[in-house]
């Protein structure tokens, strides 16, 4: 059974004062089952982030409908968790309090302090539980944003270029932590990324977009076992295939 469906979805942004229209997405049709890890790749301006915001319910389509378990998505809900390109932390709360507050919105029971400590330790922030956002680097703050959403275990985890601000080693570590969470709670992950290798490493399916207006150019299923070897011949073949479709 499909977990998420986009049926003939288009999105047009209008600038009323300038009488101008921007066609961000046009005629998007997509069906995704639960427990898939889907990455969306494509050039800038092809509507990748717009698609995530439509799925989250933050904005509504100009045409078509988006269904979660056969129910129309028309607003945000705790069933969907989203991590944006830039950290979105409450500056008046400590790192631990930020994580606890977000988790408590999803769960009626208070989040276990030990679980918070474990998650922070996994991403190298165990010593920063009592620090405030202004005391963190951009990459550290983004790791907190990821943990804050992860700990609530949403049915759909939406990631908008979440690892772009991290250094290479931290980025690879976070890729594995996100994969571990996905395999543990068996939810649906949808991630926007500009990194083709990252998409092949993490995904069961890759959606390749083309711009102006944003359309789906091709969908590629990645049939590789986890954990994946970035140096294997099959991995390299998938990476090269995606790059070729993107005209690189």
What is each stretch, according to the model?
Residues 56:
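Helix-to-loop junction immediately C-terminal to a conserved catalytic motif
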Residues 132-136, 140:
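Conserved ABC ATPase signature
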Residues 110-128, 180:
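Conserved ABC ATPase "signature" region
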Residues 96-104, 113, 221:
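Short helical segment in ABC ATPase nucleotide-binding domains corresponding to the A-loop/adjacent helical element
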Residues 151-155:
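A short, proline-enriched helix->beta-strand linker immediately N-terminal to the Walker B motif
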Residues 41-43:
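The feature captures the beta-strand-to-loop junction immediately N-terminal to the Walker
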